[in-house]
Amino acid sequence: MKLFGTDGVRGKAGEFLDSFLAMRLAMAAGIYFKDKSVTNNILVGKDTRRSGYMIENAIVSGLTSIGYNVIQIGPMPTPAIAFLTEDMRCDAGIMISASHNPYYDNGIKFFDTHGNKLSEDIEKKIEEIYFDDKLIQASKVDMEKIGQAKRIDDVIGRYIVSIKNSFPKDLTLKSLRVVLDVAHGAAYKVAPTVFKELGAEVIVMSDKPNGLNINENCGALHPVNLATEVKRLRADVGFAFDGDADRLVVVDEKGEVANGDSLLGVLALYLKEQGKLQSSVVATIVSNGALKEFLNKHGIELDTCNVGDKYVLEKLKANGGNFGGEQSGHIIFSDYAKTGDGLIVALQFSALMLSKKKSASSILGQVKLYPQLLTNLKIAEKKDLDKIKGLKELKKDLENKNINTLFRYSGTENLIRLLLEAKDIKLLEKEMKNVVEFFKKALNG
């Protein structure tokens, strides 16, 4: 049984991800981190899901039972956990969140002592420990060595200072009217605070979490309401976060929702113009072909990697780069953060608007993207794609029609993601029907 997916362990709370799994997983991770322990402290944060209370208590039980002390900081963005784990010199950090998923899902993400997401090799080692009954039992400590847990409510200030330090000192947000959709999620306090302290006129949406409304018709996955408000209020720009605030969607002053690849392109160019861009930009294999053309036109190289912001960061480390991201809105400025941080991206885009004295639409309009169609097809089984009869011929036929293809399985669900890209949208729509029918027969019997 495999526990870890594309981004930590994730599943339906109370079913797959129940208190038993959370406690045992915390013990397994704690056993792994014990070998390199310095402070014997592990940081635990969460988003605003009601199930977070159950999972948090289970994690605390697991860690303290093997002798770890736990620092609980309550609802905070995922990037805040990455930052604070290193800043507070903890052995590791744990974030309880299912990111953009509905409230009934939850997840557990781990960070090492430097605030980095774990490699697949480390995740595999933790899985091996999880299934080793003897090792789990042997790790329990005597009564006098049981760890302690304490809750700290004032660490938000440290994170706010770090975020504000990413914004240019010679700029102010005083001339900007900004609408923030915080998705009833982890950024509901910190995002408005940061923008207000930097001088912006701030209108906040979806900032009343009740444990069940996170991401519900709001936030980065549902920016249509934000777009309506931006137009109605004649705001300069709108920013939509997801439940744990590690991704960002931008809405321009016309109410148009920006594609993440457009955002990547203009921010990369902004960094280059400032002399701050190191090496090549990193994007994922699903990035739009027009992004590469835009970057190359401006003398910027593009490297690609698998989907997942931890793979973006790994590629950045390998090529000596400091900027990259995903079409979905996970964007990494590694000079400022170890993971995607929606707040940092929002501030950098605001700085770009202010420094250029241009509207959001005129800036984002520089990148002319090609049409893409994505279908998430539910499937009965995940067969080896290389062994599916007729697939090679299908891809060759599409290639001959100047259609780029990417077919890949979801890391967490029984889905295959079918991506087609071409200059002709009508051709795409026609061919997508054929592709869907092909995979329905191949993977659903």
UniProtKB/Swiss-Prot annotation:
Gene Ontology biological process terms in this record: carbohydrate metabolic process; peptidoglycan biosynthetic process; UDP-N-acetylglucosamine biosynthetic process
Record's keyword terms, sorted: Isomerase, Magnesium, Metal-binding, Phosphoprotein
Positions bearing Phosphoserine: S99
Tree of life domain: Bacteria
Catalyzed chemical reaction(s): alpha-D-glucosamine 1-phosphate = D-glucosamine 6-phosphate
UniProt cross-references to SUPFAM superfamilies, sorted A to Z: Phosphoglucomutase, C-terminal domain, Phosphoglucomutase, first 3 domains
Cofactor binding annotation: Binds 1 Mg(2+) ion per subunit.
Keyword Ion transport carried by entry: no
Active-site annotation: S99
One term of GO molecular function: phosphomannomutase activity
Post-translational modification: Activated by phosphorylation.
Cellular component aspect of the GO annotation: cytosol
PROSITE patterns assigned to the protein according to its UniProt record, in alphabetical order: PGM_PMM (PS00710)
The protein's role, per its UniProt record: Catalyzes the conversion of glucosamine-6-phosphate to glucosamine-1-phosphate.
Name under which the protein is recorded: Phosphoglucosamine mutase
Record organism: Campylobacter jejuni subsp. doylei (strain ATCC BAA-1458 / RM4099 / 269.97)
